């Protein structure tokens, strides 16, 4: 039996039945080879992700404790997409989006589509319709924990309805996943952390909404607040660590640290300084920072202020970091803990 003839007959039958392009050779499908990305708003995180940003046409999950910077990171991604002329939507299931803060992060709130649904089914139906339109570049669902099933809303307080939210998420993701890929829309699910009862070994932490999202997500980011940034006695920001817990596009388990300043978001200047020093692009001698024999300032805060006042110098250093990121990514992210043998490492506090 001639295998090539049999294959040709099978392919032509499939194309007659389901349309041209139902089956194709992977190498001839250029779109599947090139991954289009949108910057996360953090240069270090873009490098940690291995593809220069968060992938379009995929599902991304950002989870962490309260006030760790989940919504901030998602809004930075919206701002970056809007800079490229993209259309973004925000499904605000928590009814807690602050437009003033979003504007400070660089989001064009006049062009941002927002929905504040009454229940989980409505939220996911709206998300599905927007994704199927093919016009949306980034869609954010904030948050999975707030997607309350209609049956729970209509029931009494204290009613036991086990697995209802997990079933809702599982069904929604089955419907959404093909549309997301075809429309090349990035869908970011923000999620919260809960504690599992009776866990003796390993981390007791888990995310809400069942296991479906863990499987369907191409990228999962664990974001944690690890310290405070103070000016004298006043707290002006958080030191934040993001760990790439899952990555279908590049090696996972990389982690990166950056500052989130109140009212400003991710501190781009601080990140450029830190990454520049690790890459050898910015020289640090004692407390002085310099680049190409040009002094940037004494102390980190003064050097950040200098970079903020000199955007040309900032752009030059950032370009050098991006250019070398392929070579220095491993050094920048050195010290990332190795994964466990089963592929999922325990989450840190």
Curated annotation (Swiss-Prot):
Organism of origin: Rhodopseudomonas palustris (strain ATCC BAA-98 / CGA009)
GO molecular-function term, one example from the UniProt record: ATP-dependent DNA damage sensor activity
Keyword set includes Transcription: no
Principal location: cytoplasm
The protein, known as: Protein RecA
SUPFAM superfamilies the record matches: P-loop containing nucleoside triphosphate hydrolases, RecA protein, C-terminal domain
Listed HAMAP family: RecA
Cellular compartment(s): Cytoplasm
Xref: PROSITE patterns: RECA_1 (PS00321), RECA_2 (PS50162), RECA_3 (PS50163)
Domain of life per record: Bacteria
Keywords for this protein: ATP-binding, Cytoplasm, DNA damage, DNA recombination, DNA repair, DNA-binding, Nucleotide-binding, SOS response
Family membership: Belongs to the RecA family.
Gene3D superfamilies (alphabetical): P-loop containing nucleotide triphosphate hydrolases (3.40.50.300)
GO biological process: DNA recombination; DNA repair; SOS response
